[in-house]
Structures are given as C-alpha cells and as structure tokens.
Amino acid sequence: MKKIRVLVVDDSTLARELIIAILSTDNEIQVVGEAKDGKEAVEKVRELRPDIVTMDIEMPVMDGIEAIEQIMASNAVPILVVTTRGDAHTAYAAISKGALDLVVKPDVNLTEAKEFISRIKLLSGIKVITHISGKRKIQKVIDMPTSVSTEIGDKIVAIASSTGGPDALSVILPQLPKNFPCPIVIAQHISDGFVSGMVEWLKLITKLNIKVAAEGDVVSAGSVYISPSERHTEINISKRISLVDRQPKDVYRPSCDVLLSSVASVYGNKALGVILTGMGSDGALGIQRI
C-alpha cells in the first residue's frame, strides 16, 4: 500500500518532533520532510511533492499565510493548518489562501493523536486545484426588496459543512444581501476553539449578521447562526436556539444531523437543507428528513 507522504512545517523543533512522533505511529503515513519556516516549506513542497502539508502560521523568514499562497499558486497540495487557539483569526486567513482545514496543535494524549492522524488521512485524499494569489472576485451584492421578507418569514436555510467548508462559506455568504429573507443556521465540523475566529473572519467579508449560536437566540431573517463546536445546536419549537451537550461517543462536532433533524421537525417543508461539504455520513439522516 502506498503511504501518505507528509511534510511537517513549524518553526518550533519541539512541535515538529511531536507531530512527527504522532504520525510515525501509523504505518500508513510517512513523514518525508520537515521545514522550519515558510520559505523552506515552499522549496520542500516543490522538491518532495508530498501528499499533504501540516503548516504552522507564525514563523520567521516567511509566515504560513504567505507560504500557503505560494504553494497553492504553484504546486497545489492539501494543507492542514496546525496552530494554537490564540491564532484563530489569523488561521482563517490561511483558509482564504487555499488551506483545507485547521486544527489545534496536538497534545500527547491518545485521543488527540488519533484525531490528528484521522484528519491527515482524510485531507490527503482531497483533490485541490491551483489557487492563484488566494483571491476571488466576489460578485456585487444587490439587496432584496424588503417586501419579500414578509412572504417567507417562516422559512429557514440549514447548512451542513465539513472539510473545506469555511472556504466554501467565504464564497457563498458574501453573495447574500444583508436583508436576506430568512435565517441561516450552520453546523460546521471544526476543532474546539476556532468557531469565534471563523465568525470574525466571515464578518469581514459579508453584509449578513453572523454570530456564534447561543442558548435562547431567536433565529431571525438576515442573520447567520454558526454552531459552537463544544455543543450541538438544535432549533426548538419556539424557533429559538437550544444547545445540546456532546456525548463521548459523538464522532462529529458539532453534529450536522442534530441540527438538520431539528430544523426538519420545526419547519417541515419550509426548510431548505444544504450539504455544503461532507465527511463521513454526518448530515445524511438530517437532510433526508428535510
């Protein structure tokens, strides 16, 4: 079996050694190289042609943001941003340049190590395309007539999103007007500690009111509610947000099925469900109910 070839990029020797040690426990993965800064990473990608790159953000010589931009413009490869919770906002800038996903730097505990390895295996199989300068042309947003909203106030859009989702959301949401006539609720698979950073990043590029869903929020037209990763999100019969505790057995966080199923129960045929990107089967049951 062909092994997954990984390039590890981090200015911290200790961090590189930890990531390499974790990856080396899986016989399907081979670390083919390491780099201590973005400039070296760009060169190593060109030389080694890895299947996937783990990329730190804050580094000397060339930071991770610029390295991602250069790599995706010349030798496109799946990139997983590996950073700290404090770097959440900066990390999402990396997504806009073409990185596929982000995770918190793994610890030595077995659960985090297994999750990290699973993410590497998943992302390494995704086909990526050249991402010139990490920029897109966003179409001009035209606000909808206010009279429209009175006709469809009972409708809702529910989005299930996984790997590659933040990048896709950064394309879709900016094209919606600030008076979008119904609420949008989103369950995005994401590591704990990064939801607030994603929300702040999306606020910069869209006219919509975007927030992390909170217990008791009344869902309203023109607003986007993104589920926190620490709990699952439901819409209750009063059309308010209810947050549900995660269970140890839960594989996905937050759960797309939980959100979509609750939306189907409350809104019935006035709900629009969207599977934006997928990982495993999460969302399949919920979208069937919608």
What are these regions (language model features)?
Residues 10:
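Conserved acidic carboxylate
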Residues 2-4, 14-20, 28, 39-40, ...:
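Conserved acid/base catalytic micro-environments in cytosolic active-site loops
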Residues 36:
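Glycine-rich phosphate/oxyanion-binding loops and their immediately adjacent helices
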Residues 23:
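Aromatic pocket-lining residues of Rossmann-like dinucleotide-binding sites
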